[in-house]
Amino acid sequence: MERVRETGEKIIKAAAVGAMALLFVVFFLLFLQGFTFYEDAEFLYSFAKVPELAVLCGLAVLFFVILYAALGKWLSACRIKTIRIVEAVSAAVMLALQCYFLFYVRSYYKWDSGFVIGGAASLVETGSVAEEAFYYLSVYPNQNTFVLITAVLVKLGNLFGIGAGVRSLLFNTFNTVCLDVSVFLTLKLLQKWKKNLRDWEICRIFLLFLCNPFLYLGVSYYYTVTLSLPLSMGFLYLLLSIWEPEGGKEQENGESGGKKTCAGYGKAVFAGALLGIGYELRATAVILGIAALAAGIWKLAAQKETVARDGNTTRRETVARDENPARDRKEGKRQAAQLAVLLLCAWMFGAGLNAAQKAYVGIDTEDTAFPASHWLMMSLTMPGGHNGEDEAYTASFATKEEKEEAVSARMKEKLEAMSRADYLTLVKTKISNTFGTGTNGYPVFLADALRTDGVYEAVFGAHKDFVILWHQGYYLFLLLGILLYILRWGYACIRKKETDFYGFTLLLILFGAVLFYVLWEASPQYSIPFMMMMEALCFAGLLPVQNTEESAGQKGKMQKRHCVTAYCAFAAAAVVALWGIARYRQVTQTPGEQPHPVATQILANTSCPVDDGEELVQTIRLTQPFNRLIVQWRNPAQEESTAVYRLQLRESGGTVVFETEIHAAGTGYNGAGIYDFETVDPAEGDYEIAMEKISGMPSDDLEFVVYDMYGYTPYSDGELSLAKEGEKRILTASLLFSVSEEKTESYTTPQKYVIFISLLFLIFLFMGFWCKLKVVSVAGEER
């Protein structure tokens, strides 16, 4: 029996080490690829070759590595009071930046959330799902939890008199709270996981956390990928609490073991609730449950092995035990029971919530919902993301059985048409698109904003290259820390016979996420639910270096490392200066197209017909120069149409800025107008885009493209109205339009370029001198 137990444990350990080795290989390849995988930096990609792109991204990664070291040298010498002040000021700056993006820039997530907001608002106000959102919620019933959350927020907004036009602020405020709570929980998790963390180390981690640009850009990402973050991190924090052994501080403080056990079961129930709700909100939460179960089984098996040997082992396992085998046995039973309670509660809460939300939404999705195999089938089309053709194919079948049969047949056809090399290329593309970029798709999903002045151009517009580099450098910094942690975990597991089961749980979640998106629909945004886990693993991988140095007192090695850090900073400063000189003409004197959006609304789901005697008017706010207007329409009569429309862009007072005619004759069903005119400096007050029929048969009407979703108007700075014979009817919709300034000029001015390069050079230089000065203080025993 003893030999069977040993063999079983060896098999489990071998499988775990093998999985971590595969995860290391995947992340290492992503790390290498990441140095040239940031194509959203369009200006840099327009002239830079692969080596230059790799060097620029390498500078970004090196910046965060040096910053991590420099902050450690500074904060380790600070008093507690200073550290607290730094934390408070940093938190205030973070909140200020979040408020700027939340309340001023006001970008918005373009896709699914609109249907959910409209459906939730109609449920609250009419008791049924709006027609505009019905298809989406009938096809994707997995969004019902998202609908419930949104409905609660709509009710809260109605209570405080918040109208449909500004509801997005309420939703995004809630989204920001979710982001900040997840950051707080991640920091608390690290403190509980790495118990020897000192105050200055926690402060350093917090400051590096604040360098993550998603904390600011993501405030408007009202979607399940962000709303699920606090649920996931709360679950993982409670899981770590459950796995802690009884005793310790509680016994020292006179607390009874029974009270600790009851609290443990309470945590298990709460963790199960978070996992169940998280699963209903986003199905990838099942990966957390599977990882917790797998790691828990291994942990309990290793603990049982140790107890069976009566404590007389030659191997060391990092399990909760003391010198009393009976107590160890009791501890193992407690943890097994609490893990079982956790999983049972997750199932109960998930099933209960699922039933409640189905009853609330009130849509029979038996035949309309897509089968799970649909996403497997759809992801077999390069590049492995969502595509409308496969969605239309699945939706065209009436019943559940027909959908499953048709999807299975189409999946088989796709697989038979693919060679092994094609499939491997698809897998590589899906993994790269999901876990290979640090932007999380924000240039696609969040680029549309209400305000396009201020920092918009540098973050979302044609000058976003530096911010893209910042994203990619920070993400590769995270991957570097994770790779270091995997190496340390593997070394401890194989050589020292020590297993960090909690770290293994986090790694197993990432491993499961990679496998999941090999099979499922892939997208850059789908790595967001795992962002905080990656942060925790990164800092866990970086922390042991500092702790080992100080605990061992290896000051000679410290001095050498500080010197290396300083010289790396000096080298980076030199590269920045040389690159700045070499690319001066390219950046400051080479003309290129520099489009700048002034007011934009690109969501569309229907069209609004404009009959004889009617005028469709969209009011907009323009605060920057503009010279281009774009609108779209539908022409049901197509080539035979006789309709002629007048299109005007005018001030609210009536002064016409631009006017043209739209002739529908000889055109197809889908039409668009791109109109250029002399650059106009905006006047005070609002502007209007007006469409009016001036001739043609009564039956030949154009229908202008709009976004009409009950309770959700994506363009909140104006209203859409339909006027006829002096009467104006306000529509709960937004016209699809774009007003922009198209200009040809250099990327930036010489003055701005010199200032930017000089600042970057001085920052690297300062960090290098700081590290060098700290070497002197270490050698002189002044720390």
Please identify what each model-predicted range represents.
Residues 129, 358-450:
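Membrane-proximal stem/loop segments at transmembrane-domain junctions that anchor or position
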Residues 206, 267-282, 293, 514:
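Membrane-interface alpha helices of multi-pass inner-membrane proteins
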Residues 119, 135-165, 173-176:
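Short hydrophobic/aromatic helix or loop-helix immediately within or flanking a transmembrane segment
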Residues 114-139, 145, 384-389:
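Extracytosolic helix-loop segments that constitute the early lumenal/periplasmic catalytic or substrate-binding loops
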Residues 43-58, 170, 429-510, 562, ...:
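Membrane-interface anchor segments at the N-terminal boundary of transmembrane helices
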Residues 170-195, 234, 481-490:
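Transmembrane-helix motifs of polytopic, lipid-linked glycan transferases
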